């Protein structure tokens, strides 16, 4: 019909537009995520993850925090941890220590599993990108977790933002700073949609416990299962991920290949996981929001540039005096631990 023909033409035009943007992004030099070069590239940028601190609605404390972060010397903990930002490339301090038990590292460790799940569930392919500068505003940038690059998939051109909270409850509603982060990502890449994927993983104590819970691929309560190998190489953690939803025979073949490939590394542990909570919601680009906030972000960046020259000492936290400490009131907090049995599955998948 005529209406179907029009819809098909619009779809093709949309794909051509996505083709153009993905080709543009592919030409941008992109250092690997969380490498020293990646952190250096982020130095001269307000990135999507901290842009919420630059808005007109941000508190003075938040603005002070981002300005200080962008002025003080950088300490790179390692290629899988967070950092502050550097003053000059000569001021880099580097440490190989990695806290693999931190909530941050938990998210880093499981992000590839989340991507594998997303690709498998939606029959798509995710392209990975480094730190991408805004095409118009040179002080803005973003490091998306990925973009759908399978052209015959209805999610073609849709961005992907992943969060793996270790303890925070998954509600399906992005926190305001995450929403801002995705708006900056879409604005930087000039794409109009982003899937906000939240996943939570629990871990088995042993291979026997893993095998006893349902089938090799699925738990008794209907959750996907999988395996990660944790190695140490050059003093840093290295992970290998079993293909998503692999059978036991496929796992055994993967095991041999993986151990052979990593024979120069030290094997530390095998992690048996269960994906016990998933939420995926669509976030649309809001161009008017960006127009309303670009001035505020620019003003914060102008302050950063000025104080890199004039000094930023006044931004640092003030040391408390003995008199300040004596005025503090001790507050007791009572936290009731949640039973694992109370964990709910959030099912928000839709055919958008």
Model-based region annotation:
Residues 1-352:
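Accessory terminal regions of nucleic-acid processing enzymes
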């Amino acid at each position: 019909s005529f209406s179907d023909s029009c819809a098909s033409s619009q779809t093709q035009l949309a794909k051509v537009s996505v083709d153009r943007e993905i080709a543009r992004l592919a030409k941008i030099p992109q250092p690997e995520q969380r490498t020293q070069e990646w952190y250096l590239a982020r130095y001269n940028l307000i990135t999507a993850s901290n842009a919420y601190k630059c808005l007109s609605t941000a508190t003075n404390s938040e603005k002070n925090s981002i300005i200080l972060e962008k002025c003080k010397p950088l300490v790179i903990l390692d290629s899988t941890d967070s950092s502050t930002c550097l003053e000059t490339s000569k001021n880099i301090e580097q440490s190989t220590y990695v806290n693999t038990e931190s909530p941050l590292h938990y998210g880093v460790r499981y992000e590839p599993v989340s991507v594998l799940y997303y690709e498998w569930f939606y029959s798509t392919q995710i392209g990975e990108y480094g730190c991408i500068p805004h095409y118009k505003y040179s002080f803005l940038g973003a490091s998306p977790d990925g973009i759908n690059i399978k052209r015959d998939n209805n999610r073609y051109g849709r961005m992907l933002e992943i969060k793996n909270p270790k303890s925070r409850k998954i509600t399906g509603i992005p926190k305001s700073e995450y929403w801002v982060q995705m708006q900056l990502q879409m604005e930087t890449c000039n794409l109009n949609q982003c899937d906000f994927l939240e996943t939570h993983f629990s871990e088995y104590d042993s291979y026997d416990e893993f095998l006893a819970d349902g089938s090799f691929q699925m738990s008794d309560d209907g959750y996907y299962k999988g395996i990660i190998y944790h190695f140490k190489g050059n003093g840093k953690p290295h992970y290998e991920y079993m293909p998503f939803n692999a059978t036991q025979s496929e796992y055994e073949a993967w095991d041999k290949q993986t151990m052979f490939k990593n024979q120069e590394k030290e094997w530390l542990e095998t992690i048996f996981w269960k994906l016990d909570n998933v939420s995926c919601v669509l976030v649309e680009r809001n161009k008017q929001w960006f127009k309303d906030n670009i001035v505020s972000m620019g003003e914060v960046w102008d302050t950063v540039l000025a104080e890199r020259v004039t000094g930023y000492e006044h931004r640092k936290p003030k040391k408390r005096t003995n008199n300040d400490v004596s005025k503090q009131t001790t507050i007791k907090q009572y936290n009731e631990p949640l039973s694992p049995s109370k964990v709910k599955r959030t099912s928000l998948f839709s055919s958008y």
